[in-house]
Every structure is written in structure tokens, then in C-alpha cells.
């Protein structure tokens, strides 16, 4: 197999499909993860998925990826705007990563406009709904 990709979903994304569907859509996290795995396989890559509502658990999973994963795709959700610790973890493992958001955070509340990750990310994908996950997998496998 080619690239190994780790997909990390942050807080509240376990509620996909039911939480604010007018913003996040009706696709469940389970369905989204399966779709991403299948798409990665079709490109000759392997994708692992992980979700947590806890910042420390996300950091631990990033650390565990060191030396084992080629690319990280992360939707840090609310931690985008608050977590220097996740930023530091991503910098510390020296794995290229893609920052991903379902909605366009710049069209939402002002506090969502700042990201602690964007300036370190290889790419930022936002505003494409759950289709952004497919785009992220494509970019990760073909370019990183």
C-alpha cells in the first residue's frame, strides 16, 4: 500500500448527521469515515480514522502517529480557535497535515475566523461540506 493517512475529527463531530444539519449536513461520522477509507483505498492508500472530544486524547493520537503515518488530515473543530497544544503536537511530530472544516469558518461568528493551525498546514480545505473530506484525501495521497 502507498501512503498512510490519519484522519482526526475533533470535538462534537461524533454528532455529525444530527447536530446543526443546516451547517454540517446529514452524513454521519461513521458513514463519512467509511467513505474516506474506501476513497483512500481506491487511490492505493490506507486511511485510519480517529475522533475525540478531548484535547489531550487528540494530542496523544498525533504523537502516536510519529514514524507511522505519512499525512494527517485534521478537522480540529472548536479546537481550531483555541488549541496551541494541538498546534505544538502537529509541529512536534513533523508530519505534513491538512486542516479541514466542513463549513467556511470565515462566514460564521467572528471568534471562528482565527485558526492556530492554518499557518503550519500544508493545505486548508473549508466550506465544501463533507465533500471537503474527499478533496483532502485526494490532496494528501497525490501531493504529500
Curated annotation (Swiss-Prot):
Reaction catalyzed: 3-dehydroquinate = 3-dehydroshikimate + H2O
Pathway: Aromatic compound metabolism; 3,4-dihydroxybenzoate biosynthesis; 3,4-dihydroxybenzoate from 3-dehydroquinate: step 1/2
GO terms for biological process, alphabetical: 3,4-dihydroxybenzoate biosynthetic process; quinate catabolic process
EC code(s) of this entry: 4.2.1.10
Cited CDD domains: DHQase_II
Domain of life: Eukaryota
Site (Transition state stabilizer): 19
UniProt keyword terms in alphabetical order: Lyase, Quinate metabolism
Pfam family, one: DHquinase_II
UniProt GO MF annotations: 3-dehydroquinate dehydratase activity
Positions of substrate binding: 75, 81, 88, 102-103, 112
Membrane spanning residue stretches: none
Active site feature: 24 (proton acceptor), 101 (proton donor)
Assembly and interaction partners: Homododecamer. Adopts a ring-like structure, composed of an arrangement of two hexameric rings stacked on top of one another.
Its job: Is involved in the catabolism of quinate. Allows the utilization of quinate as carbon source via the beta-ketoadipate pathway.
Similarity annotation: Belongs to the type-II 3-dehydroquinase family.
UniProt xrefs under PANTHER family: CATABOLIC 3-DEHYDROQUINASE
Protein name: Catabolic 3-dehydroquinase 1
